[in-house]
Amino acid sequence: MAKIISAFIDESGDFGFTGEASKYYLITFVFHDQSIDISKNINKIKDKPVFHAGPIIRREYPFVNVSAEERKKLFQSIFMFTQLLPINSKTFSYNKKEYNEDLLKLKARMTRDIYNFFNDNRELFSDAKLLVYYDNGQHLITNIINSALAITGLDYEFKQKVHPENYRLFQVADFINCWK
């Protein structure tokens, strides 16, 4: 049976260029070889709440009444969890002002960077099936990732109906994005 590699993807930012639009756009991939069992790692944090950096930092639901000390502990626990996992990650970072409000240039650069990453690391992925876990938070990102992977010739599949609360590695991608 072919090796299966999971790719959990989280993004941070938006595609706007004016007003209150974000200055940066980040896309983080977290890779896990499914032949390596991480159930013991996951069991250690099974009683922890779902990690989502934005609501924890901004004290949004469900963290409205959670003290700063408790929220700090959540970050510490996801940090330790992440450090002990047999995973690899890659974050792509874009300073949007470098694209002079040209969304097409930004999309082209993202597609090219993701394609180049997979092509440059072909030996890691060529004998594997890549299962892509993305919640379709931004449809443009789904299209960019699909376009980049399609031209690599790698065997990949997008998992359907992905919800971050169901996957701790998706939450790790969110944490890494926040940390970067």
Residue spans for each PLM region:
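Phosphate-ester processing/binding pockets and catalytic centers
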Residues: 1-180
